């Protein structure tokens, strides 16, 4: 007996998804390329006060200085060569003296140094009561 081989139709009723996957991949690549847009920033002026009279720094406070050049850190006018020594000294000063912290940053100091200090103060539950500014000369 002669048998004919039956053709198996694998396609059936299921659609071919390859073109759909190609389109999804192309759209995904397009979105990834357009999502990496460079952030634009505006030039900003440093804050000043409008008040001609600036309150004197409370002598009963710990003054933390952020300097423009190395060493970047100082406590009550005493500079520290690195962040580790400064942070240990600041923690000790705050725990021993229980005085409020005043931050005095040099106008030419990097913002990154201020952000680092504020992050450290927040992590250790230290509240800075004042940020020193200078009066505007307009």
From Swiss-Prot:
Residues 1-16 are cytoplasmic. Its main location: membrane. The gene is exbD1. One of its GO terms (molecular function) is transmembrane transporter activity. Keywords: Cell inner membrane, Cell membrane, Membrane, Protein transport, Transmembrane, Transmembrane helix, Transport. It holds the Pfam family ExbD. The accessory proteins ExbB and ExbD seem to form a complex with TonB. GO terms for biological process: protein transport. It comes from Vibrio cholerae serotype O1 (strain ATCC 39315 / El Tor Inaba N16961). This is Biopolymer transport protein exbD1. Involved in the TonB-dependent energy-dependent transport of various receptor-bound substrates. It is found in: Cell inner membrane. The keyword Protein transport applies. The chain crosses the membrane at residues 17-37. Residues 38-138 are periplasmic. One of its GO terms (cellular component) is plasma membrane. InterPro entries: ExbD. The lineage of its organism: Bacteria, Pseudomonadati, Pseudomonadota, Gammaproteobacteria, Vibrionales. It is a single-pass type II membrane protein. Belongs to the ExbD/TolR family.
